[in-house]
Amino acid sequence: MFSRFARSFSSDDRTRKSYDGSYQSFNAGERDLPTPTRDWCSISQRITSERVRDGCLIPTPGEALETAVKALSEKTDSLTSPVLQSTERHSVLLGLHHNNVPESLVVSCMSNDVHDGFMQRYMETIQRCLDDLKLSGDGLWWVYENTYWQYLKYTTGAEVPVTSEKVNKKSKSTVLLFSSVVANKPISRHPFKSKVINSDYRGICQELREALGAVQKYMYFMRPDDPTNPSPDTRIRVQEIAAYTATGYGWMLWFLDVVDARVCRHLKLQFRRIRGPRASVIPDDLLRRHLKTGPAVSAGTGVAFILAATTASALTALLRISVLWRKEEWRDGLNGTAAAIVAAVELITLLHHHFQYLINMMLIGYACWGDGGLNDPYILKALRAQGRFLYFAGQLVRTMSTHSWVVLETSTHMWFSRAVAQSILAHGGKPTKYYAQVLAASKRYTPLHLRRISEPSSVSDQPYIRFNRLGSPIGTGIGNLECVCLTGNYLSDDVNASSHVINTEAPLNSIAPDTNRQRTSRVLVRPDTGLDVTVRKNHCLDIGHTDGSPVDPTYPDHYTRIKAEYEGPVRDESNTMFDQRSDLRHIETQASLNDHVYENIPPKEVGFNSSSDLDVDSLNGYTSGDMHTDDDLSPDFIPNDVPVRCKTTVTFRKNTPKSHH
């Protein structure tokens, strides 16, 4: 039976020998074999090869990536707003030959999303979190008021009686994060004495909420389809939102300065201004600066006209609120003060949630279209403004890390993952050159490496590694900071030795001036940087002048040299440069010297003798009359990023520095 089948199969096969070499015998000796055996040998060659070729499903890299993109697309489509996937949007973008989204299309998508579907899942999730707490209005009131008293005691040193905790920390954080966002009406409805003013205030707050929601919606729908290629129009919009965020955080610090001063005056508390006024510019000037010179306006292209109008609406509402809180009277007694406090905390938590929403949206994807990715100066300024606010007012608010935030806002993160995967699949499994530069700017794949400094032979060969890590409220906002501080001529992390290390958890008595200790200059504080060194205390670093003399960082020119040695020379991002004169010459960095979020400047570098830290951003463009001279805000302190421990302070009059006691 088998031989008959083999002979018939072989006869049909002979007619096709010329078309497939695999049917021919590969061994001349096979001709002497019996017919069934000889035919089976030729058949087996074809059967096995075709079976392997047609039946094997081991995925190739391209197939695996394609399958992953398909699965990710299905999941993403179920989470994102239907308007983002609409036929209208896709048809318009397909007809374009660039990676920009016309603003008319952005506005159209915003209008079509009538019920705010872009945030529906997000709002439902945080509403469930609040519902699980089962807190009444009185419970929410207590959380806001108690949190403020703790914050005031921490920031001013005033003797404020703080009641014991009635709510656990998790519930308290949930309230401070989300309660003001989902509230249909304010908890404190009468913060001012006049009923008319209270009504006006509630109306302005409602306008503010609508403007904040419009900015968030605009940002959601302004994204192009390809994050791995540049988008000039989107870059301007991202910069406008980042500048708007930095301006908003500056206003919030000014607002808290006013509220804190009025509370202390109403209750006749001893107001110890430990850190000085935290906002250096009054709201009129601060907001006017953005409205006139913001990125959307200064670009002059009109590609972000609607966005500029939307951010202007929000800032205008803040300006109107400033007038009320600065001039209108509060209700009498402790109850009146408490009502004002709760209203203030509601406003601050609402704004902080809004601005951290915008920043987190940048960090999970929108920064791809910034100028140099995360090295965009406007994005860095927004991060610095948030960090500055959290440093001074971190006790009053709560901040979600980006990793926690994407659990709530899953759709945007998945959308960017899908878009990047599709682009990599289209480019043969490799990211574009532009996207590779974005990743380099994020430092996720190009960490900073510093060459270890050799220790003198008289000292042990064991490495001496010191890190100063901030686990403070600022850390919850932008990640922990590993600070390496150069004091005198040696590296140290001794917090108690001097005030050169930022320490937000320091007790109040440690912030008071110490007349018996001279403050050592703080020289270098760099984010996300670890310095692995071998060093001996009081031993000079091997960084000296050409004549062999050691470098003293308290002198401006010496400090500048050490700073350059530490951070590396300014260079093009595509090249690596080494300074042959330095023992720290093996430095790989993707940013210029000015691209660091945190940087402290010694007093002598700017011509001051007082050991004060200057906030360069706040003093930018300072002129006579810029310093707020209202009774609520003392002009005797300059704004700073860290607590100042010194007997004297510096103020500014007509751009002329003066020291006083």
From Swiss-Prot:
Q: Where is the composition biased (Basic and acidic residues)?
A: 10-19
| Membrane topology (UniProt) | Multi-pass membrane protein
Where does the chain cross the membrane?
Answer: 299-319, 339-359
Keyword Manganese among UniProt keywords: no
> Mind listing the GO biological process terms from this record?
regulation of DNA-templated transcription; symbiont-mediated perturbation of host apoptosis
Chain residue ranges for the region called Disordered: 1-31
Q: Name one GO cellular component term.
A: host cell cytoplasm
Where found, per UniProt? Virion tegument; Host cytoplasm; Host membrane
Query: What post-translational events are described?
Result: Phosphorylated by host LCK. The phosphorylation seems to be lymphocyte-specific.
Presence of keyword Transcription: yes
Q: Which Pfam families match?
A: Herpes_UL46
Q: Which key words are in the record?
A: Host cytoplasm, Host membrane, Host-virus interaction, Membrane, Modulation of host cell apoptosis by virus, Transcription, Transcription regulation, Transmembrane, Transmembrane helix, Virion, Virion tegument
Role noted for this protein = Plays a role in the activation of the host PI3K/AKT pathway to promote cell survival. Interacts with and activates PI3KR1 in order to phosphorylate host AKT on its activating residues. Activates the host AP-1 pathway by triggering phosphorylation of host ERK1/2. Participates in host BIM and BAD phosphorylation, leading to apoptosis inhibition.
Q: Which family does it belong to?
A: Belongs to the herpesviridae HHV-1 VP11/12 protein family.
Q: What is this protein called?
A: Tegument protein UL46 homolog
Give the organism's phylogenetic lineage.
Viruses, Duplodnaviria, Heunggongvirae, Peploviricota, Herviviricetes
